[in-house]
């Protein structure tokens, strides 16, 4: 008989979207091990998001670089974990699982960089393509959890966060209860970014045809992409890029009527909080990493080489899979989404 699990370490250091994908697995593990105290190991930049995920008892944040990771080993060993779940599946995460001193370590059999060698239990992944959310849930099932009919994404709903969001929107000119469209124009890969002129035209059309405020969001590193869009807009731009702490993103996107976005972390947060998404996909596969659940729209242009998962493009028409999606297609998708949405802002 397996000893009870009272101290559980979940390793999912990055990135924003992947952390969101792991939330239903956390919820399933909490049901499977209700007495367990759960610690989540995460990179420092994403720790504020994990702090607002329901069911996390402690956040163990790590700084960049080998020294930052190894500096956390004494803390992990002192915690005396009964079970370590590695959802990252890379050498560094597998090594941290082993260095934690825990005798029971689980991860994927096909984990990369040899990380599966550090596990005492390896979970097979079927060959057919599946969404990352469902793939992570395989680990919970292997540990005896019941697969949920409706995977749960639950953030802590804090009054101070709601107030901070309303204050931010009010200062930007968005009235309480006013419908608005969020727009995320950046992505980590350049090949995942819809052209700024397309975003600008879509924003102008929405503002002019429906008097919908379009609010650009993103982190400080995305300021240049947002400025490139606002410089091309003819209508008034509301740009909150760089002004939203990552821990407030769930509350901000919950307040939005809809999100127009590249394949990015905010896309997954919006889907998690129930906000409809219109997503632009180029080299990546929405079957594996698209907005999870029903009620979302993915737009892309069919070419024979997609999904290629490349960070460069050698086609005669560069990034045709993405750039061939026209602004009018996005506007039409937004209109259709808002018409059938139950969120405020139906047209």
Model regions: which residues?
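Catalytic machinery of carbohydrate-active enzymes
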Residues: 1-347
